A protein has these predicted regions:
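Membrane-topology segments of multi-pass transport proteins
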Residues: 1-35, 68-90
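A structural signal for multi-pass alpha-helical bundles of membrane permease subunits
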Residues: 36-306
Length: 306
C-alpha cells in the first residue's frame, strides 16, 4: 500500500490579500492633513517674518520716548501720539510728504504719457531685421543701470538749464528711469491685442488718437494700473537723485527728511524716526491694498511670452 497516497497534499494559496478601502482612505486623509499643517506653519512663519518689522515700526512710533529707551516688550504699556505731533508740527514733515506726492504723481503722469505712446508704436510698427525685441531690451537698459551712472550728466545738464533748486530735477530724473520700464512692460500688452480691434475702429472712421484712447487703452487698463503702481512707488522712495539734486530743505522728499531725522543733533530719536517711517509707507500701503487686484491681474496677464 502506497503510504504517500494517504497523506494530505499542501496546495499553494491562490487567493488575493485584500486591503480595506477605508484604511487607505484614512491613510490618505492623514497624509493630506499633515501636508496642510506643514503648509500652514510655513505660511505663518513667512507672514511673521514679513510683518514683524512693520509691527515693530508701528510699536516704536506709538510708544512714549521713555518706554522706547527702556527696551520694552512686544505689547506697549502706553500709547501716545507725541512722536507724530513733533514730526509734523516741530519738524515740518508734512512738507516732505507734499513734495514726494507732487514729484511722484508728476513723474508718473509724464512717464505714462510718453511711455504708453512709445510702447504702442513699437508694438504696431514692423521693424526690419527683427529689431523689435533688441530695441525693447536696449530701452530697458536705462532702467537696469544704477542711478549713480546718470547723476553727473544730469547734474551738469540741470545746472546748465538753471533748474537746480526746483522740483524739476527730481521729477525729470524719475521720469527718465520710469519711461523704459513703462515701455518694456506695456509692449507685451499691446502685442496681445488683435489688430482687428483697431481695424474695426478704422472702418467706423476713428482717427489714430481715437483708436488709441477709446479702443486700445481701455483693454489694457490692468497693465496700466500695475505699471502705474510700480512707477509711483519708485518715485516715492527715490533717494539717490534726491540727495544730489536737491539743494533747498523746502524741496526735501520723504527719504531725505528721514535721513535728516536720523542724523539731526547727533542723537537718533528712534520713536520720531519710526513715526516718519509709518507716515511714509502708509499712503503707499493703502494705495496698493485698494488696487492689488489690478496689480495681480496686470502682472499675470502681461507676462512676456517667448
Amino acid at each position: 500500500m502506497d503510504v504517500t497516497g494517504m497523506l494530505p497534499v499542501e496546495r499553494p494559496y491562490r487567493g488575493k490579500i485584500s486591503i480595506s478601502r477605508e484604511h487607505i482612505r484614512r491613510k490618505h486623509l492623514v497624509k493630506k492633513r499633515v501636508v496642510f499643517t506643514l503648509k500652514g506653519i510655513c505660511l505663518i512663519v513667512l507672514l511673521f517674518a514679513a510683518l514683524f518689522p512693520v509691527y515693530w515700526l508701528v510699536l516704536m512710533a506709538i510708544r512714549p520716548t521713555a518706554e522706547t529707551s527702556m527696551g520694552a516688550g512686544l505689547i506697549p504699556h502706553q500709547i501716545t501720539g507725541e512722536h507724530f505731533t513733533e514730526l509734523f508740527v516741530g519738524k515740518g514733515f508734512g512738507t516732505a510728504l507734499k513734495n514726494s506726492l507732487i514729484n511722484a504723481v508728476s513723474a508718473l503722469v509724464m512717464s505714462l504719457v510718453l511711455g504708453l505712446a512709445t510702447a504702442y508704436i513699437i508694438s504696431r510698427k514692423r521693424f526690419r531685421f527683427g529689431m523689435k525685441k533688441p530695441l525693447t531690451y536696449w530701452v530697458l537698459l536705462v532702467r537696469v543701470l544704477p542711478p549713480v551712472a546718470f547723476v553727473i550728466p544730469l547734474y551738469t545738464l540741470f545746472t546748465k538749464w538753471n533748474l537746480m533748486g526746483t522740483r524739476l530735477p527730481i521729477i525729470l530724473s524719475c521720469m527718465l528711469v520710469n519711461i523704459p520700464l513703462v515701455i518694456w512692460f506695456m509692449v507685451s500688452f499691446f502685442e496681445e491685442l488683435p489688430e482687428e480691434v483697431e481695424e474695426s475702429g478704422k472702418v467706423d472712421g476713428a482717427t489714430e488718437w481715437q483708436l488709441f484712447t477709446r479702443l486700445v487703452l481701455p483693454l489694457v487698463l490692468p497693465g496700466v494700473a500695475a505699471i502705474s503702481m510700480l512707477s509711483f512707488m519708485y518715485a516715492w522712495n527715490e533717494y539717490t537723485y534726491s540727495v544730489i539734486l536737491t539743494r533747498s530743505p523746502a524741496n526735501y522728499t520723504i527719504p531725505l527728511a528721514l535721513a535728516v531725522l536720523n542724523t539731526e543733533d547727533n542723537v537718533t530719536n528712534f520713536g520720531l524716526v519710526a513715526a516718519g517711517g509709518v507716515s511714509s509707507f502708509l499712503p503707499v500701503a493703502l494705495f496698493v491694498v485698494f488696487a492689488q487686484n489690478y496689480l495681480i491681474s496686470g502682472l499675470s496677464s502681461g507676462a512676456v511670452k517667448e
